[in-house]
């Protein structure tokens, strides 16, 4: 079986001979994701919206769950900058994610369980 990389680059299937290097890469990716848990992040989406919230989890399809999420629309000529829309718990489909920015660690950040 050859290596398969999906359109958004998230799911991988390794060949049987790939060995330890794939396992180490998987462990590294898992540790990186675990280090981002409960951190605030901004997700830019393909339609121009931005969501800001606390990273709670992801799945193998690269969908992201944000807690205490707020939605920000891209300002335009007909719609000036508005107040954010409070979403609460939000699921962002992986195929709609353009970029993810993680907020620097803050001392007063809330911890979600």
UniProtKB/Swiss-Prot annotation:
Protein name: N-alpha-acetyltransferase 38, NatC auxiliary subunit
UniProt-listed InterPro entries: LSM_dom_sf (IPR010920), LSMD1_Sm (IPR034110), Sm (IPR047575), Sm_dom_euk/arc (IPR001163), snRNP_SmB/NAA38-like (IPR050914)
Function comment: Auxillary component of the N-terminal acetyltransferase C (NatC) complex which catalyzes acetylation of N-terminal methionine residues. N-terminal acetylation protects proteins from ubiquitination and degradation by the N-end rule pathway.
Ligase listed as a keyword: no
Compartments reported by the entry: Cytoplasm; Nucleus
Keywords recorded for this protein, A-Z: Cytoplasm, Nucleus
Main location: cytoplasm
Organism of origin: Xenopus tropicalis
